[in-house]
Amino acid sequence: MEFYTPNIVRVSKTLESGNVNLRKSLAVVLEPTQVEVNVSRQNDMVKASSSLLEVILDLNTGRVQFSNLDGSKLLTEKDYGVQLMPLQYVQRIREKKVESHVAGEVVPTQSAPGQNTPGLDRGKMRTIVENTYEVSQSFILDEDEVIYGLGQQQTGKMNQRNQRLVLEQNNMQIAVPYFASVKGYGLYWDNYSITTFDDTPMGTSFRSEAGEAIDYYFLYGGNGDATVALLRQLSGQAPMVPLWTLGFWLLAV
């Protein structure tokens, strides 16, 4: 667990012991700031408190719980709710040769399996092996808690409870692994592989096909506007389009 700000906490979990350096995020631009955190331990419970947020880690089950300073629970992980299943992805690619436009030297390039580009010599096949994990984390939300987000989904629903959504980019379907709760917090799941969001009476989970670790950010703003501001602080501020462009857009293909 790491406090990036007094109300933004990063949670990472791996199967490795000791300090593990994860890859630099492609989406998160915020760097950790100097945050005063009070840490205490009672038996298997470790509590870390900033000026705005309290986080409790159960060393026995690995469960993380987020609360505000008056003790009201915001979000709780499910007991033993983390899964990291080792996987190995194998891809065969063909190296082809093409003349450089700069100096005329021959340089190797890569193409997808079965791709046949005219004018290029067929090269040798090469195998790429990547060891990774299928990663999953489950949470417990209040029964009547409403959450928004997860991108542009064609379900006709605003509240994303009681749904199973596959988060991948498709025409008219934009996936964003982030949801915001009416309780004033947001959760950003930092993973770029195909991810399944699943909410049932048994729990709420993100499951990604590939990842080196469980990696997510908890943001507590207290209300929707403040939480969106924290997300912009975390991932960068996208400029608004000019006022004259707002209105009805139509693209006919």
Predicted feature descriptions by range:
Residues 2-46, 84-87:
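A low-complexity, Ser/Thr/Gly/Pro-enriched, surface-exposed linker/loop concept
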Residues 41-253:
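Catalytic and substrate-binding clefts that recognize carbohydrates or anionic sugar/phosphate headgroups
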